């Protein structure tokens, strides 16, 4: 028996008995050791958005200070900073001169896309942080960006109520989609030629079938739907400013499950208001999701059997406005982008909060 054949057979045996990465993701999550949570600081103003590289080695974050930082996950070191510029220097500054409020990284880790309040989309080479292209065309702040998985097709959403499709390889605009009746507050996509959006105060979630030039309209939340994330190709999670978190199927026009006041309430007795849900995240192709607000906690949830309901797992102490949440591809850690203010405004200021990134290690129950 040749060594290579022996290795192949051994690998087959291991595959038969070892858990797949997918099965590992479905093991029950345990609350993290708080002492192992790290805070990375570098932005002068609140962190507004973040992405994790597909290999889980790096985090890119952006801020109201208009800067973008590339971090090393293991060491916490700042590897590169793309400085923000002053308003009015757009013609000569390489980078953003307005609050950066959304970003996406291609599934092969080659391209980073960032969008700002000044209607601009910037494309960067993720490895070097070299500026490649600038996309113009939106007539309002760019509020959502997502690369279609397995491609370099980029979807963008804006407060101008439109979605645009771009081909980054060709540095080209493809088409514009219309339908929302209010500003679009969030966008996500998977591997299919479609994207999902949250429509703010038009109270709708929409699934856009790009090739068919059609859209599905879903109704559920009573207030502004502010964030949305794919769980898998069939399900998604949303958060709203009425404090609710909802679980959806692309096959049903109403939520499968809604948790009201998911982060509790605040205010004087009789005048309590729910904490807004400012960020949601999903561990891709698993049953684990997370939500963030400004109640000093990130809440983790398990999607119940058949994705019919949301079960609270545990909360993680995180001080400040949780403006962005992302699970690593492996499911081994969660990153929260936080700030003293909400990413889109200055309604409140939490002076005791730090502007930065919380790296939260995730542990799972060991198999028997």
Task: Indicate residue ranges for each PLM-predicted region.
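WD40-repeat beta-propellers
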Residues: 68-72, 121-125, 145, 163-166, ...
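Intrinsically disordered terminal extensions that flank WD40 beta-propeller domains
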Residues: 1-45, 338-339, 346-351, 361, ...
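A conserved positional marker within WD40/Gbeta-like beta-propeller blades
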Residues: 67, 111, 120, 139, ...
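Loop/turn segments within WD40 beta-propeller blades
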Residues: 51-56, 103-109, 115, 145-152, ...
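WD40/WD-repeat beta-propeller blade-loop signature
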Residues: 36, 46, 55, 88, ...
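Structural hallmark of WD40 beta-propellers
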Residues: 57-60, 109-113, 122, 131-133, ...
